Every structure is written in structure tokens, then in C-alpha cells.
């Protein structure tokens, strides 16, 4: 899971980035689910799931992560918070 804090003047750009990133996620065969969400006015997140650790690592080294890190200085007020989580149960 990742959370990002957009610069106040870049909120719309971060929304657009995340909305468009789903197309890159669809290309990742090992990414099972991918969601972007908004927490408050300028805080956003991505929640995604993978079949196994190799899928997670492929994603973390993939196009979305690369684009986010390249654009982070321009778009984000602080470094992204990336946490590896394991789903314990689901419905």
C-alpha cells in the first residue's frame, strides 16, 4: 500500500496521474487487483494485491513506480509512504 501527499497546487495532477495509472496496472499480469483512492483533499493512496512476492516485486519495480518516483519532486509535498502489507482475509 502506498500513500502520497500532493502539493496543494498539484492535487488535480496527482488525481490524473493515479486515474491514468490503472492502464499500466492492467498490463501487469501478476497484479491481481489495483485501486487508487483519495483519503482527504491532498492525500491519496494505492492498494494492490499480488499472487506472490515476485508479483509484488515486479510491480514495485515496474512502470507505475518508476513514473511516480520520477514525478514525485514536482507533484508531491513529501516522499511517498510505501508499506508492504499482507491480506489476512477477504470476502
Task: Give each language-model segment a name.
Residues 88-91:
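A short acidic, often aromatic-flanked loop/helix-cap motif at beta-alpha or helix-coil junctions
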